[in-house]
Amino acid sequence: MTQIIPSLNGLRALSIFAVLISHIQDRSLHLQTSSGGQIGVNIFFVISGFLITLLLMKEEERNRSISLKDFFIRRSLRIFPVYFLLLFVYFILQNLSILDIPAGSWLTSLTYTRYFFDGEWETGHLWSLSVEEHFYLIWPFVFVYLKRKRITFAWSIIIIIPFVRLFTNISFMHHMFSRGDAIMWGCVFALYHQPLTRFIKAKPSYLMVLPFLLLLCCLASKKIFHVVGNDSTLYHVLQAFAGSYGTLTNICIGFITLISINYKHNLYYRFLNTTLMHHIGVLSYSIYIWQQLFFSEHIGPLSTFPYNIILIFVVAIISYYLVEQPFLRLKNHFIKQKPSEEPTAVPVLSTTP
């Protein structure tokens, strides 16, 4: 038995819209790119850390232990099929002389280290999946074997990484060492979700708009911070801690996630949980995987707006129902219940970049 956490697929839908709009601005309309795409990716990161940590907490509570083997099998069934299908399609297109992907991109894409290589457009988005995959390789072990140090580890990451962004002048923004704190903020909000939920519910409802307003300020951060001069120390401090993928952005996303789940009697909640938003959220991983190809100049008329957007959704739907869904069904075989207990309703929404 599974329980769908409300609003999260709606948030995923908003995230993928932000990424698509950013790419439409840049690749199709040749306009100055907004920061919406970066914030969209950070929403994916925060939600991913939040859900993975909740799942680990639920499994530990239910079974008094966590099966790392089952965890990695579930993650592999979720992430790998569509990811490697994309690379297989790229391989075919390269052999047809449609794409020209360098060896470095192939190597880093196949090994989930894409953020180490500044390559071509078509595999450029896979950096975020590399970040997430490395999170999967670290956090579950910390959670299982360093139980008393979980919170210390999480706080250490989210304190250190903003200073990495600062002292590198954010010169590698698509990197585990500059973006990993977004996922860890999701973990922290999961670890503290009960007291934070009580805190939110105890506050006047009109205050719930505050993280949304602050996130809009982060979205406009480049223009706002421009007044202090792009080369000034203050500018880099502001970008590292309050920019479009800075600390303030991640905190706002964390609170927005909890607000979106718990404040149910308003238009915003109903909007996030409409059938359309739910289904787009379900498709968001496939949309993210395939959208890069349809913004590529190498595929000719197929990349023309708005036809490319239609193609993205068509391919994502086919990909989800023919590839993702069959593997997702297999995941249920690796969710164990204690035989002496009734099945607990576990939130098993899949995580995406």
What are these regions (language model features)?
Residues 4-58, 79-82, 113, 182-183, ...:
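Functionally critical transmembrane alpha-helices in membrane proteins and complexes, commonly lining
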Residues 133-160, 191-208:
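Solvent-exposed interhelical
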Residues 209-326:
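Alpha-helical transmembrane segments of multi-pass integral membrane proteins
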Residues 73, 79-131, 162-166, 235-237, ...:
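Membrane-interface helix-loop-helix regions
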Residues 6, 30-41, 120-131, 167-185, ...:
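Interfacial loop-to-helix transition and helix-capping segments at the boundaries
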Residues 17-24, 92, 113-115, 158-168, ...:
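Aromatic-anchored segments of alpha-helical transmembrane domains
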Residues 273-276, 327-353:
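Membrane-proximal cytoplasmic C-terminal regulatory module of class A 7TM GPCRs
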Residues 38-41, 45, 58-93, 105-108, ...:
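Transmembrane alpha-helical segments and their boundary/interface "anchor" motifs
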